[in-house]
Amino acid sequence: MAEAKCPFSQSRSNANVAGGGTRNTDWWPDQLNLGILRQHAPASNPFERDFDYTAAFNSLDYYALKKDLHALMTDSQDWWPADFGHYGGLFIRMAWHSAGTYRVFDGRGGGGQGQQRFAPLNSWPDNASLDKARRLLWPIKQKYGAKISWADLMLLAGNVALESMGFKTYGFSGGRADTWEADESVYWGGESTWMGNDVRYSDGFPGVTKHGALSGDEPPHRNIHTRDLEKPLAASHMGLIYVNPEGPDGNPDPVAAARDIRTTFGRMGMNDEETVALIAGGHSFGKTHGAASSENVDVEPAAAGLENQGLGWSNRYQSGKGPHTITSGIEVTWTKTPTKWSHAFLEYLFRFDWELTKSPGGANQWQAKNTEAIIPDAYDPSKKHLPKMLTTDLSLRYDPAYEKIARRFLDHPDEFADAFSRAWFKLLHRDMGPRTRYIGPEAPTEDLIWQDPIPAVNHTLVDANDIAALKRTILDTGLNKSNFVSTAWASASTFRGTDKRGGANGARIRLAPQRQWEVNNQPWLEETLSALEKIQKDFNDRVSSTGKKISLADLIVLAGCAAVEKAAQEAGQTITVPFTPGRMDASQEQTEVESFSHLEPVADGFRNYGKSSSRVRAEHYLVDKAHLLTLTAPEMTVLVGGLRVLNTNYDGSKHGVLTSSPGRLTNDFFTNVLDMNTAWKAKDGGRDLYEGTDRKTGQPKWTATRADLVFGSHAELRALAEVYGSSDGQEKFVKDFVSAWDKVMNLDRFDLKGSGIARSKL
């Protein structure tokens, strides 16, 4: 195997314009980077601020678009010919690899933003030749323009590909608005070589030079049957969507490969049945490409010359296309009908015995023993080939749990087809959030548990008079205002802008698993929920004849809003915190406990929860949480400052509560974190906790965490803190805190015009 090599240039750009030269990150690579809070700003978007993609998609002639996609499937182009005269396999792979980057731990990845167009994804080894798939789609994208995003089009093309080959899909929803730059928030791994996994596994593999396959001829790693993949990653190698098709680190071991498959597919939200359905269903079509050694393949799109116009992986082997194509290095066509739906994949998997062999490109693959050549050639109708499989295909036979499912699918083809249609739909829509976001004539109406269903509003909503009366009742309970603020934040701040999961709607804060999370399993939550449930019952009983009701989800948010208003009033400022009813309460039966467990925060710096790890400091966790909440740096700053003085630390500690009047919405946090009369010293070796003392007397004044002191230490955050800590900053602080609070409370209110990201005002 060639020496491992970094996939990017080892030398910095010598350009002395356009941002070239030595940068801050070169001097201080560990410095906190706020860049992910500034992504996808209006300045990068070519459309007007009032452009409504949902309205544009709904104006689309959807079935005309599908007709054009159907025609494209068999319109083979000389510059990139279609295997078997049909592009279906290519477009299925494109859609799969667009959506399949999703992972459950942070909701990042997935097909929701069309990120496959940008580096690094457009240049991953696993995405070789998908640059051509997108160019084949360009005439259709050009024709329909802004009415169909790339994000939607790439996935719809995969759906139409299945239909064009005789498979009945479960449905399709549009609504994925494009972004216009690479998403820099995603941790794809720490490796610096393609196919490397020496960071994500403690005893991983160093990777390969350029484009290529790992050598399976080297001794297998001792831990491929036991190793644990680093969180939040799902893929087993840098540059792969899923697992190595040759087996773990190139070792052709189907049983060990099954372990990697279960980890990877599980981390994208798929159970064993869905995993088997996706692999067996997807591999019922098309082929892989390994006509010759990967040494013939040139650099990826991001490294290719200007004259290549965004295309990469130029192939020097003969024609470099069609029968001479090289992508994975594996040369496998799974069935004798690669352009028609069948259950032949499962039939062959169990009918034949398999022996290890090599592809023309030198990759490990498996060939059927003692049988005749029945597999058609993709370009020469006079040729036939022996049936072949990937190591990861054989995992479905040799892993006991997968085998049981696969044999059931083999015996019940209708059940297999239904399972594949549902798993494929889930794959494409996992990061779209609730079904209320679905648009288009083929969007299914069935509620599915992984969509986190919430009942539709079935009662008259409270009006302004009701809201005012409920606020008074809430504040008259005698509970501390911080209880209501903490509960509302705990409920709403589960939202993730990445996959549109979580949020206050549904009131799942009262259900398992959220109620038992360490960050929530505190006395204040039980006290608050008990009080609010009584208020809800009393109100609903009193107004039952009017048809009005208030959900607990609404009441939790309203209580937080009432407490913030009262805290501002006690600080000398009158302000109304917006509140819009319309949330509903989900049931425990509508809540998939295992799935929701992935939303539990490792850290929530807004509540001073969590500690630094050996690799991640508390302030990095804070910025990551802010990104999941779609917050800007000013919004993060004002929220931390406000939540501290409102005394909302998860455990009731006084760390960072830099005020002599907790519970009042003052700008004291900022004035005190910026106070030069305070000297700070680490209390626990500089890990997380600090003590602030009077610089003259040495008397203790405050304690604070890294998530607090970063607002005085980090130059950019200090600049923001100075705005709110100035003598004229109090009024702006309250106004901005209420705006950011309102945004977080409504992040999951997809029924409101301008909800979520669009509500950002700072």
UniProtKB/Swiss-Prot annotation:
Disulfide bonds: none annotated. NCBIfam families: cat_per_HPI, PRK15061.1. Heme b binds at H283. It catalyses: H2O2 + AH2 = A + 2 H2O; 2 H2O2 = O2 + 2 H2O. GO terms for molecular function: catalase activity; heme binding; metal ion binding. Its EC number is 1.11.1.21. There is a cross-link at Y242-M268 (Tryptophyl-tyrosyl-methioninium (Tyr-Met) (with W-96)). Pfam families: peroxidase. PANTHER family: CATALASE-PEROXIDASE, HYDROPEROXIDASE I, BIFUNCTIONAL CATALASE-PEROXIDASE. Its cofactor is heme b. It is an enzyme of class 1 (oxidoreductase). Residues 1-22 are annotated as: Disordered. The active site is at H97 (proton acceptor). The record marks R93 as: Transition state stabilizer. Binds 1 heme b (iron(II)-protoporphyrin IX) group per monomer. There is a cross-link at W96-Y242 (Tryptophyl-tyrosyl-methioninium (Trp-Tyr) (with M-268)). It is found in: Cytoplasm. It comes from the Eukaryota. InterPro entries: Catalase_peroxidase, Haem_peroxidase, Haem_peroxidase_sf, Peroxidases_AS, Peroxidases_heam-ligand_BS. It comes from Aspergillus niger (strain ATCC MYA-4892 / CBS 513.88 / FGSC A1513). Keywords: Cytoplasm, Heme, Hydrogen peroxide, Iron, Metal-binding, Oxidoreductase, Peroxidase. This is Catalase-peroxidase. Gene3D superfamilies: 1.10.520.10, Peroxidase, domain 2 (1.10.420.10). Homodimer or homotetramer. GO terms for cellular component: cytosol. The keyword Kinase does not apply.
